[in-house]
UniProtKB/Swiss-Prot annotation:
A single Gene Ontology CC term: endoplasmic reticulum
The keyword Endoplasmic reticulum appears for this protein: yes
The name this protein goes by in its record: Trafficking protein particle complex subunit 9
Main location, first listed in the record: Golgi
Membrane-spanning parts: none
Cross-referenced InterPro entries: TRAPP_II_complex_Trs120 (IPR013935)
Gene name of this polypeptide: TRAPPC9
Organism of provenance: Bos taurus (Bovine)
Modified positions (Phosphoserine) in chain numbering: S557, S944
Purpose: Functions as an activator of NF-kappa-B through increased phosphorylation of the IKK complex. May function in neuronal cells differentiation. May play a role in vesicular transport from endoplasmic reticulum to Golgi.
Gene Ontology biological process terms in this record: cell differentiation
Entry keywords, A to Z: Cytoplasm, Differentiation, Endoplasmic reticulum, Golgi apparatus, Phosphoprotein
Amino acid sequence: MSVPDYMQCAEDHQTLLVVVQPVGIVSEENFFRIYKRISSVSQISVRDSQRALYIRYRHHYPPENSEWGDFQTHRKVVGLITITDCFSAKDWPQIFEKFHVQKEIYGSTLYDSRLFVFGLQGEIAEQPRTDVAFYPSYEDCATVEKRIEDFVESLFIVLESKRLDRATDKSGDKIPLLCVPFEKKDFVGLDTDSRHYKKRCQGRMRKHVGDLCLQAGMLQDSLVHYHMSVELLRSVNDFLWLGAALEGLCSASVIYHYPGGTGGKAGARRFPGSALPAEAANRHRPGALTTNGINADTSTEIGRAKNCLSPEDIIEKYKEAISYYSKYKNAGVIELEACVKAVRVLAIQKRSMEASEFLQNAVYINLRQLSEEEKIQRYSILSELYELIGFHRKSAFFKRVAAMQCVAPSISEPGWRACYKLLLETLPGYSLSLDPQDFNKGTHRGWAAVQMRLLHELVYASRRMGNPALSVRHLSFLLQTMLDFLSDQEKKDVTQSLENYTSKCPGTMELLTLPDGLTLPPVPFTKLPIVRRVKLLDLPASLRPQKMKSSLGPSVSAKSPFIYSPIIAHSRGEERSKKIDFQWVQGDVCEVQLMVYNPMPFELRVENMGLLTSGVEFESLPAALSLPAESGLYPVTLVGVPQTTGTITVSGYHTTVFGVFSDCLLDSLPGIKTSGSTVEVIPALPRLQISTSLPRSAHSLQPSSGDKISTNVSVQLYNGETQQLVVRLENIGMEPLEKLEVTSKILTTKEKLYGDFLSWKLEDTLAQFPLQPGKVATFTISIKVKLDFSCQENLLQDLSDDGISVSGFPLCSPFRQVVRPRVESKPVNAAEGGRPGEPCHVKTLEAVLNFKYSGGPGHVEGYYRNLALGLHVEVEPSVFFTRVSTLPATSTRQCHLLLDVFNATEHELSVGARSDEELILHAGECQRMAIQVDKFNFESFPESPADKGQFANSKHLEEERQEARGLEINSKLDIHWTIPSLKRTGEASVEGLLNQLVLEHLQLAPLLWDVLVDGQPCDCQAAACRVGDPVRLEVRLTNRSPRSVGPFALSVVPFQDHQNGVHSYDLRHAVSFVGSGTFYLDKVQPSGQAACLGALLFLYTGDFFLHIRFHEDGPSKELPPSWFCLPSVHVRALEAQA
């Protein structure tokens, strides 16, 4: 026997072997359809008996193996079933002849045979025959199973007769010597009458009868015969048959202990009798003795238990039997099959280590020269048995050996598909799976070097199969999962091979389905490059949408009727943590930053890298990048445009590396850091681009509010100068610009500003709205810088050192602090024209212009954008007022304001006020200018804290009053300067310069006195009269104070001024009063008026002056002297007309 049956198991010893073969030409499909139905009848109960008969079917069985039927009866072909097609009666004789030829092949061992004929109808088919069954077709053959049962019963009859014949004790008869084929020549010439020979014959026959009893369902009798045979054969050292007897004993014991079988076949063997399930469950318990259907006598069960081996003894007897087989070179197949049977029993007993010893012995059993197909079968069975005992890696090893055997060089047509299929089956044994997700779970499992070798073999096998897509998938899997174990050279080799493959068949993310139904998942390159962090970026500051504030406040939601709900606030914490608190805008380019790392020892080119999103229609704009070798963390920004609104989730990214397209999901990336992957997309908004007439600034403003400045512009102005800033607004978006608001915020707080620094008018610009995409609108912003024009202390010191002497009141007051030099002041450099060591007087003003605009669908939803323009203004000093004072004018309603003006520029400068002549000042020159001004009525400003409650204290009130007065005075003065060489002009302000004393001199008294001579007001001009004519004199009082005043008594004193400092008051001979020289005024209410009248008579010609003075009585003493400022009266007496 040269062909081992690797599917053998211990329970096969009780089966009858039936061969099913086709006769003539029968299609494979039809043959196996009937074969499947025939093989379903594998166990039947014998009539009138409680025994069961088991059948083992084979469609191919070497005839020479039947020659070992005396050695082990289950190897003998006892039944033959042939299947044939016959559609004509003419073919019937030839087919029947072939049937007889087929029977002759197994004729020496056959008990019975059958021929199943399909397709023949007519007279021949209607003849009743026991050995032939006719059926019209393969579909119309309902009695096949019944015919097989009858056939098996006929086999049982022959088997039973043989058993009875061999088991009957025939005293005196000579027992024949049963031999195996290779023994026949060894027994020629032996003494057949010797006692040793007779024992040998008896022992072998006892063993043979035990086999027949086991096949006939008589388990007890078989155990008895096996024991007797063992004793007889051991005594004569017949080791080969002793091993067979021991194996038979083991098989019978296995059948008793393990009624479910050891071969792992579907379904357990069924035993007749209703008590079978209970006894099968209890059979493994010591002392649980039940019948197995032979008879109901418990004594038989006791006897069987005594003769039956224990589970431990079964293995010992198997070892002994195999040791006897090993003594015979020609018994290698028997030894190999015994090892396989023992392994299956040990697998049931979960004794893996002992089973591995039997398998190791089976590996080294030397058989004849096996064919390549037999080698493949042998290694495959060894693999299955190692898998059965839990030795997965050993199983995978032999499976891989079988795979390599399929493509051995000696095979003319290598079976690459079979090789590939076997290699796939080895993967679990080497802790490999074809799902790359399994390699993201914890540490690497398995032997990486072996795994890489196996994956390389899969790549090669799939290529030889002619499936390049499969090669690309396996090579991609190798690169992705084994990257950490590849050397630098191996990385280069693998990637080069991958590029060669993908040049013909690009790698995709589709599932690959193999012919056997196995699917290979896609392999995304999550390590090429490695992504460590993903961050969704906010839009640029100028494009970030902002929500218009509701009048109800931000805590009120339109979706909930409740002001506060803890359910809303605390639910879905995980989902909230992934959602980002800024928004993207429909139609705008949005960015996601990835920190990537190239683990390869060479430059990595990544093509077509873009974002994977869900929830919103998103147009990803692919990028291509090249990462240097082992680059470290490298920032990469991926962009895209959301096309619709809603909530968008960035789920990953896609790449094309080495020709393999990958979809990499963030959830499958190990160790990745992300601040969130979900963001809200709001409706589209317009995009505003701003350009100005000023140059961009190198200074970057940093507002304390944290606002981002998109554009910075700068300008250099002289103090008091005004610059026009033209702002160009262009709608570069796709939505109309419908709303625009402009606000400003001054960032500089150290410098005191006077007047409006920035001013504009939007009416004409807004008239052009809505501003359609691509359209432009402009408007003008006026930049007016008016800082303090007073001189700083350090500059005053410089002037004093230069010998410049100025008089008047110092420029400091209780209500104004002198500005100290700033810490950031630095020497003026050569570009600014200052002398070395001269302090810098350039000041800086910074402001932010905010353009709040909206339009389109986003405006409907209440969103807007804010664009910030930073303005940096460097203010150089133009002129300084170093001293200020006043002089009275000829009119009581006017005075002279004296200003010492210093030219702080490096250019010639002219200063003027109103329409007066301009004063020319050279660089660094100081001159005094006098300006005649009308006195001011300041009574419209609050007098006390009680009059204006918003001022916290009297000091603050007084400061406000000072500023208001300074503003009014400055508006009337209209002081301006011009630098002709630069063609630059500006204004100079006295705001903040005037101290309290100067203000008092510039203020109109609360009591307004008017003197009229002959009805004409007399203030600074002489009133003419005739000598001898009475002159009417009227004094009027207007009370502008908030209180009532009076009564007053006034005296008129005439005098003459000789223009040499001498005044003559003794004018009784020259001036005469008509009536009394004293005038009386009654009490005058607030805003009221009063007047008193008198007359004078001038007797001589000349210039006379009238001095009106008050009597120092009670009412006049309560008021300050400045309230009684009456104009000087000049009367010129002329010759009387003739």
